[in-house]
Amino acid sequence: MDNKIHQWKTGNGINAVSRFWTCKCLFGVKEKCSVRVNYIMFDVTDHCNFRCKHCYKNQPDDYTDINVDNIILFLNEFKSRGQRPSIVISGGEPLLYKDLYKLLDYVCDGRSVRVNTNGLLLQKKLDKLLNYKNLSLQVSLDGYDDETFFEIRNNHYFDRIVENTRTAFQAGLNVYFRATLTNKTISHYEKFIALSDKTEVPLVIRPMYNTGEVEQQKLKIGFEELCEWQQNILKRGQIKYTGGKDLISESSCPLLHKDLIYSTLTVDNRGNVYPCQLLRSRQFYMGNISSDTYDMIFSHGEEM
């Protein structure tokens, strides 16, 4: 694998849950605590050009885009408090978001910014994306060939996306593949590594999160098989590994400090705010950036 490092991230949602609940349950949050958000994910649209089996979106025919001015006002509240959280822009397909470049103009100010994309439009958008510093792109590639890609993505764009990503990487864009392993592909994970080595595009690979959707239940990995896989990759050399233990350690999860409530936030395409990507049900609703102030949103969170 030469000197290139493949990064492995594992876990079954425990990191996302722990970020919110450790403080709520272990320490209790009865007294006034400080708020320090390190990372915000904005699902800017539910418009998408794919229909993936494992996606937690409802895949509507009609779509809604978040108001970019509301995002900017919301982030200005953090700025006025001396905070500049890292930003992830997701969807849907964020490259279809009509105000993507206006948002990037604002957030690409030296902080870490990532766009999660399926890569289909990457070559078309490449020239503009190259203008932004501190921007990275994560290209979802959940199959290692056209057949396994179709099993998840329901289309035959595999070769096109691989080529788009390789072209973007060679042009100087900070881009990498993100592979989500399922029970169909976990035994062939080395083929993802081979694809990464062939294209020279970096790779992040992790098991599929289980959010309870029926199609995800069909694809989820059994616990024993997941443990065996983790042991196998630990035996490999030149691999940076982030396992479940690391994910919930105090050093990597700031939420574990009792005077801090939040480490992450997720804002959906309608402006609704939740503690993280996996906690989107009604009981975790914190407020809406279009109608609630910063203080109202975090006071709602304390009442959950």
Please name every model-derived segment:
Residues D2-K133:
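Conserved alpha-helical substructure of the radical SAM core
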Residues F298-M304:
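Immediate flanking context of iron-sulfur cluster ligation sites
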